[in-house]
Every structure is written in structure tokens, then in C-alpha cells.
Design a protein with these regions (language model features):
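Conserved flavin/dinucleotide-binding core of flavoenzymes
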Residues: 2-151
């Protein structure tokens, strides 16, 4: 069932709720809706259980879409919470460029003794910064450097 046909062409929903950003898989009509939050709001959920995050997400969607929470629950098939703030390996993990980022990126993109290579969204210099696409492009660059050094 298409829950909100009038929103099918929506890519992003930006709200003034605790979880302020939502995006779809547009143009794919998969029914997947991703909520995203960062900064001080994310720190509020550092120790939250996935169920607690879901409760807040449903409240935010209820407020933004003007759909009763019970109806949202009825139509929810599954959910997953990625709590990067609580992950000891990422401790937050969203990157954005600041003054000096270009020089730092150049240094970090240089292999150490042709044996240690770095990759990730922060090392990508294109237009998709801070995304999975950026991390993937950076990884491809590192793989190409490795292949170049081993052939």
C-alpha cells in the first residue's frame, strides 16, 4: 500500500522536529524512509535503545505528516537504527570540509611507505562530500593506488 501518494516524488522532508531530516529512495519507490540527525540532537540518543529511537521517530513523523502514530505503526514493516555516535570506532562519523581541509585531504590521500592507504568520505574532494558515494569513490581511489603500486 502506498502510504502517501502525494509524497512519492519527494526526496527530502526537512522538519523542525527532534529528528529534522528524512529522505526517501526517490526515484525508486521502495517504501524506505530514512531519518537522520546529527550534532547536539544526536548526542541525546547516544545511549538510547533502538526502540527508544523508533518511538521518537514515530512522534516526529506524526507531527510532520499529520498522521496518527498508530497508523504509522500499522504500516511499519521493519526498522533499523544506526547509532554512529555510540559506535566506538566512528564516534559520530559525519565529515564536512573546513578551512584547511583541502591540504589535510591531500596529506591523508598520500600512502605511507606505499603500504598504508586511507579512504573514506572525508578524503573525497568531489561534490558528494559526506556521503556513502564519497566513501566509495575514495575507496576506489585507494584501490587504484594499491593496484598501481603492486603491478
Amino acid at each position: 500500500e502506498e502510504m502517501y501518494p502525494e509524497l512519492l516524488n519527494m526526496e527530502f522532508l526537512l522538519t523542525d522536529t527532534l529528528i529534522p531530516a528524512w529522505w526517501t529512495q526517490f526515484p525508486d519507490r521502495s517504501g524506505v524512509l530514512t531519518g537522520w540527525l546529527g550534532g547536539p540532537q544526536a548526542s541525546l540518543f547516544t545511549h538510547a535503545t533502538p526502540q527508544e529511537v523508533l518511538v521518537e521517530a514515530l512522534k516526529c513523523l506524526e507531527s510532520s505528516l499529520k498522521v496518527p502514530e498508530e497508523k504509522l505503526k500499522e504500516q511499519l514493516l521493519n526498522f533499523r537504527v544506526a547509532n554512529w555516535t555510540a559506535d566506538p570506532f566512528t564516534r559520530g562519523s559525519y565529515s564536512y570540509a573546513t578551512v584547511g581541509a583541502v591540504a589535510a585531504r591531500k596529506i591523508l590521500n598520500t600512502p605511507v611507505c606505499d603500504t598504508l592507504f586511507f579512504a573514506g568520505e572525508a578524503l573525497y574532494g568531489g561534490v558528494e562530500t559526506g556521503t556513502v558515494e564519497a566513501a566509495f569513490a575514495s575507496a576506489l581511489n585507494s584501490v587504484n593506488q594499491i593496484l598501481k603500486n603492486t603491478t
